Amino acid sequence: MIVGTAGHIDHGKTSLLRALTGIEGDRRPAERQRGITIDLGYLYADLGDGSPTGFIDVPGHERFVHNMLAGASGIDCVLLVVAADDGLMPQTREHLAIVELLGIRRALVALTKIDRVEPQRVQQVRTQVEHLLASGPLARSPIFPLSSSTGEGVEALREALGGLAGEVRERSREGYFRLAVDRAFSVAGSGIVVTGTAFSGQVAVGDELLLGNAGRPVRVRGLHAQNRPAQQAWAGQRVALNIAGERLALEQIQRGDWLLQAALHAPTTRVDIDFRLLPDELRDFIHWTPVHLHLGTQDVTGRLALLEGEQLEPGHRAFAQLVLNAPIQALHGDRLVLRDQSAQRTLGGGRVLDGAAPARNRRTPARLAQLQALRQESLEEALPTLLGAAENGLDPQRLVQSFNRPREHWRLPEEVVEVQTRLGPRLFAGERWFALVEQLLAGLRRFHEELPDELGPDRDRLRRYALPQLERPVFIALL
């Protein structure tokens, strides 16, 4: 299990983790000097179930929300920290909104610094927290009043975390491996090490992977999973990979890179999403507004084009297309957060629907029908509508990449027809394919009726006459 903290600056997140685990997280000299968390901290502890639980300590200051977002991606549970003396503060609310946008549905609340206030104040803040959570997906999350200084209440929270670790289901190992890089450093005698959370699949020593948007080939020389040496690691674990590659330099690796198998490598600058504007926003969201995108550990600027109108009211959702200033890696179902142009305010977020979004015809009824189908969680649920709207069939390799579903894990309906073209296989609904055959024959008959003295048309002329909308390789396969 991976637990991430959330909460306002100076509410005691780092102190609480130290009290829970007895371990001081990774901290920079500047953090020790200033007494605040600036970047992400990592530590591991056995909570009693025999396996290490990973903790990610995130900064609470509003200037470092981008670091908090990098740490929150891929966690199983959030530990929301609220100080009893301060109560709810701006970053409490923003961190909670981010956690909900990222789809995190397990939370424990630590009500810290109770040794500094009267019992009435503790109850007052507890009620505030309950009201804050009541309308969202984390309603009825347990609240633990405690003091990291005296130790009061810490054991109860530790036991609750241990119990939760037993409830968290191991993530599926199906799919290709990908890891969101949050750190890279050099170890004497070993070379370059990258760390991050494994989002999908599994990896083993000796595997070949691609690094970053450039797709630089690297080999896994060694690895740690949940801070322990291992031969394999898989989705849902914190992983450190010792990697090597031709002319690979530490300066070429940065937070935001992905380390993944070749089948998933598809950098993109256009992503269609299911976007939700936070209800606390004071004004409508306007089409083509500049935004900051946070996905995994990536942080990229761009603009958001609304696909169903020119503006969106607070609390509402709509299809939208991100047009980015730099390429990213994005798969169907990935959770994302959008902040304003100055990165001062969280606007909303949502899910990736299509990581290879079209630049043209993005608002047509047919395209919106495809996006409606892509709101489904699984490939099997989305496939019937996608097939019905695909004039030239579906590229199965693109579906493999978009849904991270290797072909051996597919369950295609019997009526689906797979056609081999010069560009590779295409999938058609059987009804659609046989309708194309009829259109082809009808076009050929019409040609001979209208031009009885001419010889039969050549291939390209027949395509223009009968099925001009069909791509040439698909038409050749139809013949």
Residue spans of the language-model regions?
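Conserved Switch II/interswitch segment of TRAFAC-class P-loop GTPases
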Residues: 51-53, 58-63, 72-96, 100-124
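Residue-level signature of catalytic and energy-coupling elements of molecular machines
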Residues: 10, 16, 35, 57, ...
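C-terminal effector modules of nucleic-acid-centric enzymes and ribosome-associated factors
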Residues: 5, 116-122, 128-131, 143, ...
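Residue-level marker of beta-strand positions
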Residues: 52, 101, 203, 208, ...
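Conserved catalytic-core segments of large NTP-driven translation/proteostasis enzymes
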Residues: 114, 131-281
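Conserved G1/Walker A P-loop phosphate-binding module
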Residues: 1-58, 62
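Conserved catalytic network of the ASCE P-loop NTPase/AAA+ motor domain
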Residues: 9, 36-38, 44-49, 70-74, ...
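Conserved nucleotide-binding/hydrolysis micro-motifs of P-loop NTPases
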Residues: 61-62, 85-89, 104, 113-118, ...
